[in-house]
Amino acid sequence: MQRLRARDLRAVDLYRTVKSNLDTKFSLPGMPPGREHRQVPPPWLQAMQKIPPSEILTRPIPIQHQKPNPKARKPKNIFRPQKIVYEEDELRKTFYRDHPWELARPRVILEIDGMDSHYCDWSQGLEQPSIPLSGESVVQRQLWLMHNEGMTKEKAYDLVRREFYALRQEEEVERRIAQEEARMVGAYFGKNRLQIGNELEDHEYERWKDWAATEMAKAEAERENAMPTFGGKAKDAEASIDDLMLEGSMDAILEEKKA
């Protein structure tokens, strides 16, 4: 029995192994000829025969998604599930690294029958029925060009990226025209994201200005409170020196008069 993390990892064929050993007959030294010895079945054999153990406690080797290293003499982590990597992962990572703001766009992930991807024909371009334009459209279109047109990853990405920019510009123009037409008939629109962001930035800047002014006032007050202390001592020292010089000059004048 092998124990790992306080779990019993019994072999799946434990019952079959013990059963086959019990069915084996053998003779012990000193036994009379024709007499065979049988093993005594363990007490748990009948219970395991009626209620076989589940296989959740076993450790089957997971499906290998990549070829093993032939140079590795001691394979490691053979029981650990391997990472599932798809071809689209690298394309998706590249696109969202170059266009991080696409992740901020709201998306509807609700599907009709779970087979929406089968209704798409990526040979016709990025615009597909009932599927809004998004980064996933770019990934699927690029993947189709790589598999069917024989393009490299960079060339397909550059071509699809230009198509994506053109469609985004069309959407922006349509949205702007619709907003202008609605305002002409009296519609009112609130602040957009850019205006809200500018106001938040201005508010934070004004708060920082107040804090900086307060800190400067505190520093100026501390400096003013410290200056009279040192200045007073200097003035007292200068006054004492002047008094001494004045007294010395008066004494000299009196001595001259006496002489």
Curated annotation (Swiss-Prot):
A single GO BP: translation
Compartments, record wording: Mitochondrion
Domain of life per record: Eukaryota
Gene Ontology CC annotations of this record: mitochondrial small ribosomal subunit; mitochondrion
Keywords annotated in UniProt: Mitochondrion, Ribonucleoprotein, Ribosomal protein
InterPro entries for this protein: Ribosomal_mS23_fun (IPR016939)
Main location: mitochondrion
GO molecular function: structural constituent of ribosome
TM segment ranges: none
Family assignment from sequence similarity: Belongs to the mitochondrion-specific ribosomal protein mS23 family.
Complex and partners: Component of the mitochondrial small ribosomal subunit.
Record-given protein name: Small ribosomal subunit protein mS23
Species for this entry: Pyricularia oryzae (strain 70-15 / ATCC MYA-4617 / FGSC 8958)
Organism placement in taxonomy: Eukaryota, Fungi, Dikarya, Ascomycota, Pezizomycotina
Gene, per the UniProt record: RSM25
